[in-house]
Amino acid sequence: MAAPGKLSTCRLPPLPTIREIIKLFRLQATKQLSQNFLLDLRLTDKIVRKAGNLANAYVYEVGPGPGGITRSILNADVAELLVVEKDTRFIPGLQMLSEAAPGKLRIVHGDVLTFKVEKAFSESLKRPWEDDPPNVHIIGNLPFSVSTPLIIKWLENISCRDGPFVYGRTQMTLTFQKEVAERLAANTGSKQRSRLSVMAQYLCNVRHIFTIPGRAFVPKPEVDVGVVHFTPLIQPKIEQPFKLVEKVVQNVFQFRRKYCHRGLGMLFPEAQRLENTGRLLELADIDPTLRPRQLSISHFKSLCEVYRRMCDEDPQLFAYNFREELRQRKIKKKEKQDDAKSYRL
């Protein structure tokens, strides 16, 4: 068995290079899909090494494209690699890899946002949540356009222990724009601290492992790329429903340059806003003049617990959306203006 962090000596037979595959099948990155190809196998090997020991592992790769990371995963001597690719142009090149690694590579033409990976691997791979992570991994060079909605979806799956996490605390090694990678791993108080920081870190151990310069990709993106590793925590740092945590965190960070009481106030209808915001902050023991980036996970834990109690007291509170209240107010204002015009006529 290969040592942790080392690729196995298992190698694929001689194949065209990724650059040759791109020419052979006349592949071009599609701007609409935010596609950027990583051609340097030294870098794809490094991504795979950082995922851990993959010998005899079951790997789910998202968005394989022309197959650069796919090759590195297969060279790690995995038991099985499942790839899900939305763009049909890449399927022939992936089939070439499948033929070079009989029985190892399974190709699905589909959308990672809707694919049911919980049904993809054997039930025997499942482990209790409290055990070590299962021998199942998620790896992917994500298109920029899908990376944020996809990680939020998977974080919710972690919270519910479903989707890819029916197998246990499945580890993920994924690429993001460098700025997004920095936000995911940002500490309390840092300028990069954001909604993503809190949502990821209350559920996972998050590490920004290394950065890949944009020039390593074809076509070259305007930004560098960060590789991030996620290991779900045995016990989440906030034990509340995902949607409730998400709502509190979103409201706080929508006014990221203001004091935290500004965003928290938007959790409540205008008529009770001042009173309820004060009550929330007092019961959670939060300084109302802290900025959003200064709030720790412990602060958010207290806020979510108090907000949950307030929602239990008022069952309609959680459904409240201040943007909808604002929209309705604008509609009523316009109706009054129209009525006034009609009256003058």
From Swiss-Prot:
<feature type="transit peptide" description="Mitochondrion">
    <location>
        <begin position="1"/>
        <end position="27"/>
    </location>
</feature>
<feature type="binding site">
    <location>
        <position position="111"/>
    </location>
    <ligand>
        <name>S-adenosyl-L-methionine</name>
    </ligand>
</feature>
<dbReference type="GO" id="GO:0034246">
    <property type="term" value="F:mitochondrial transcription factor activity"/>
</dbReference>
<keyword id="KW-0238">DNA-binding</keyword>
<dbReference type="GO" id="GO:0006391">
    <property type="term" value="P:transcription initiation at mitochondrial promoter"/>
</dbReference>
<keyword id="KW-0805">Transcription regulation</keyword>
<dbReference type="GO" id="GO:0031167">
    <property type="term" value="P:rRNA methylation"/>
</dbReference>
<feature type="binding site">
    <location>
        <position position="141"/>
    </location>
    <ligand>
        <name>S-adenosyl-L-methionine</name>
    </ligand>
</feature>
<keyword id="KW-0694">RNA-binding</keyword>
<feature type="binding site">
    <location>
        <position position="85"/>
    </location>
    <ligand>
        <name>S-adenosyl-L-methionine</name>
    </ligand>
</feature>
<dbReference type="InterPro" id="IPR023165">
    <property type="entry name" value="rRNA_Ade_diMease-like_C"/>
</dbReference>
<feature type="binding site">
    <location>
        <position position="63"/>
    </location>
    <ligand>
        <name>S-adenosyl-L-methionine</name>
    </ligand>
</feature>
<feature type="binding site">
    <location>
        <position position="38"/>
    </location>
    <ligand>
        <name>S-adenosyl-L-methionine</name>
    </ligand>
</feature>
<dbReference type="InterPro" id="IPR020596">
    <property type="entry name" value="rRNA_Ade_Mease_Trfase_CS"/>
</dbReference>
<dbReference type="Pfam" id="PF00398">
    <property type="entry name" value="RrnaAD"/>
</dbReference>
<keyword id="KW-0949">S-adenosyl-L-methionine</keyword>
<dbReference type="GO" id="GO:0003677">
    <property type="term" value="F:DNA binding"/>
</dbReference>
<comment type="similarity">
    <text>Belongs to the class I-like SAM-binding methyltransferase superfamily. rRNA adenine N(6)-methyltransferase family. KsgA subfamily.</text>
</comment>
<dbReference type="InterPro" id="IPR020598">
    <property type="entry name" value="rRNA_Ade_methylase_Trfase_N"/>
</dbReference>
<comment type="subunit">
    <text>Interacts with mitochondrial RNA polymerase POLRMT. Interacts with TFAM. Bound to the maturing mtSSU until the late stages of assembly.</text>
</comment>
<keyword id="KW-0698">rRNA processing</keyword>
<dbReference type="InterPro" id="IPR011530">
    <property type="entry name" value="rRNA_adenine_dimethylase"/>
</dbReference>
<keyword id="KW-0809">Transit peptide</keyword>
<feature type="binding site">
    <location>
        <position position="112"/>
    </location>
    <ligand>
        <name>S-adenosyl-L-methionine</name>
    </ligand>
</feature>
<keyword id="KW-0496">Mitochondrion</keyword>
<dbReference type="InterPro" id="IPR029063">
    <property type="entry name" value="SAM-dependent_MTases_sf"/>
</dbReference>
<keyword id="KW-0804">Transcription</keyword>
<keyword id="KW-0808">Transferase</keyword>
<feature type="binding site">
    <location>
        <position position="86"/>
    </location>
    <ligand>
        <name>S-adenosyl-L-methionine</name>
    </ligand>
</feature>
<comment type="function">
    <text>Mitochondrial methyltransferase which uses S-adenosyl methionine to dimethylate two highly conserved adjacent adenosine residues (A1583 and A1584) within the loop of helix 45 at the 3-prime end of 12S rRNA, thereby regulating the assembly or stability of the small subunit of the mitochondrial ribosome. Also required for basal transcription of mitochondrial DNA, probably via its interaction with POLRMT and TFAM. Stimulates transcription independently of the methyltransferase activity.</text>
</comment>
<dbReference type="GO" id="GO:1904047">
    <property type="term" value="F:S-adenosyl-L-methionine binding"/>
</dbReference>
<dbReference type="InterPro" id="IPR001737">
    <property type="entry name" value="KsgA/Erm"/>
</dbReference>
<dbReference type="GO" id="GO:0000179">
    <property type="term" value="F:rRNA (adenine-N6,N6-)-dimethyltransferase activity"/>
</dbReference>
<dbReference type="GO" id="GO:0042645">
    <property type="term" value="C:mitochondrial nucleoid"/>
</dbReference>
<dbReference type="GO" id="GO:0003723">
    <property type="term" value="F:RNA binding"/>
</dbReference>
<protein>
    <recommendedName>
        <fullName>Dimethyladenosine transferase 1, mitochondrial</fullName>
        <ecNumber>2.1.1.-</ecNumber>
    </recommendedName>
</protein>
<keyword id="KW-0489">Methyltransferase</keyword>
